[in-house]
Amino acid sequence: MFDIKEQLKLLPDKPGVYLMKNKANEIIYVGKAISLKNRVRQYFQSSNNQHPKVRAMVTHINFFEYIVTDSELEALILECNLIKENRPKYNVLLRDDKTYPYIKVTMNETFPRVLKTRKVLKDKAKYFGPYTNISALNETLEVIHQMYPIRVCGKNIEKMIERQERPCLNYHIRKCIGPCTGMVNDETYQQMIHEIILFLGGKEDELIKKIEEKMKRAAEKMDFEGAAHYRDQRQALLDIIERQKVVSVNDIDQDIIAMAKGEQESCVQVFFVRGGKLVQREHYILTTREDEDEKEILSAFIKQFYGETNFIPKEVLVEREVEDQELMAQWLTNKRGNHVKVRAPLRGEKKSMIQLVKRNAALTMGQREETQRKSKEKTEGAMVVLQEALGLADAIHRVEAFDISNTQGMESVGSMVVFEGGKPKNKDYRRFKIKTIQGANDYGSIEEIIYRRYKRGVDETKAMIENTMTVQEGKFSLFPDLIMVDGGLGQVTSVKKGLAALGILIPVCGMVKDERHRTRGLVYEGKEIPIERPSHLLRFITQVQDEVHRFAITYHRSLRTKSILHSVLEDIPGIGEKRRKSLMKHFESIDKMKQATIEELIEVEGLNRKVAENMYHFFRKQ
């Protein structure tokens, strides 16, 4: 057993990272320290002077681990990586940071592409971002592809050249110079990529000089078409620069950072200044508490933001001093390769810019909170109205809805979708193959899936009571406040039969539609309850009906497709179960398989030339 008091005595007086864990062995906090011995002990001393968040966290600490590092800087880097990997509950976290897109230049390819991505990999590519404004990102990509005829396809260029494949339409309409033809000079292509990187790095002035030189050389050679192309490139860049605000007389790269706090999250606004011009601004949302220290929030943002991005400016301006400011500057200097300043200006032009950024952060935070308030009215408000409409004593938080799908009784499936607080909870959705009912019997099918779903829930609950299963392992143990079923009295009766067999009492209502297939009302306790039109409740019920139907029909279609694929492929010599799965995964449809060449078939995992030829000739005979 882990004895915290004894382990505290063994802590080394060295820099490192500590990981606080709860009873479920989950990492709930990651921190760094110049002295592990002193820092970790502070958590377990008198709580009188502790921050409320720290007091709350300490009550959940079951044990801790630590990693000794050679320096505090090394500890900072390790802390950043561990926070990103584990996303601990009590650390300040960038909300949905994985979803922010980047512009990626695929430097790991012979002929690089420029594309949008949501994953930052260690693959030698260059990444620019992250962008929270998708429109700005798409506009940037559009400008790049207008200016530079680089490839957009993900094909293997070497193989295309080797097979002498035809270039695509983009080559013929001059949107791509066609490296797949084998006639493109590598140096010419790399020069375009170099200029794109200058552009993405905010070096438009340097790029314009290069383009002007090329335009001049083309004119001297009487290459008027080339000169016109460079003129258009130059003008496109000038148009972009014209939209950029000059914020500094100094030709400097800066990121200016300020924040605004809300009740449960904070908004950090960043102005990106390149060469003295404001080229872009972005805002980022962090999950925080109302009593969270602003220094800690800004510090957490800087670690997470610059841990992801490739470009580090010469100067980072923040609205107030942050934790470990000198250490942050040292870390960023190492990442950039030359000196980086992190400072909180107190007066002058830089202070004015900070105040401007802070006003923008406050405006964004206010707009976000207003949007969330209206959203809450639609979602949680609909739950209150639903409770009142049904006359239920208890509040409705979790709703589970069911539907059946089949084609003339074949491939019958059931689906369950879940809503919590009026919002879909996709990870709790479940699908069921009908096992005991033959033919098109919706009532019997619903009774079966209800029994199976809640029988699993009962079994899991028993296992948890007996300590043979943890709460985290349970997939069916959470029961709803209300069950909804697509249909009327017959479907509701079937649900109740399934529940009665298990001795479970949960309110059940049916969702009925009119002759025009529009949501009409609810069936509850033998009566139909009309729903006001339009209303938040009607929108919610319609959303539930559409979602449960979509989920059921999608599953049904996928099973039918697999069944058809399976039966056709059975007739081809050399195609067994493993190869069938590979083909289904690769092509997804019979039509695509029929159109494939022998060479394309060989690319499927597990297929050799002989089997590929068998398939090719089999489909040609049909």
Swiss-Prot record:
UniProt function note: The UvrABC repair system catalyzes the recognition and processing of DNA lesions. UvrC both incises the 5' and 3' sides of the lesion. The N-terminal half is responsible for the 3' incision and the C-terminal half is responsible for the 5' incision.
Keywords: Cytoplasm, DNA damage, DNA excision, DNA repair, Excision nuclease, SOS response
Subunit architecture: Interacts with UvrB in an incision complex.
GO cellular component terms, A-Z: cytoplasm; excinuclease repair complex
UniProt keyword annotation of Iron-sulfur present: no
Similarity comment text for this entry: Belongs to the UvrC family.
Protein name, per record: UvrABC system protein C
Chief location of this protein within or outside the cell: cytoplasm
Superkingdom of source: Bacteria
GIY-YIG domain sequence ranges: 13-92
BP GO terms, sorted: nucleotide-excision repair; SOS response
GO molecular function, a single term: DNA binding
Cross-referenced InterPro entries: DisA/LigA_HHH (IPR041663), GIY-YIG_endonuc (IPR000305), GIY-YIG_endonuc_sf (IPR035901), GIY-YIG_UvrC_Cho (IPR047296), Hlx-hairpin-Hlx_DNA-bd_motif (IPR003583), RuvA_2-like (IPR010994), UVR_dom (IPR001943), UVR_dom_sf (IPR036876)
Residues passing through the membrane, by range: none
Subcellular location: Cytoplasm
Name of the gene: uvrC
Family matches, as NCBIfam families: PRK00558.1-5, uvrC
UVR domain boundaries: 205-240
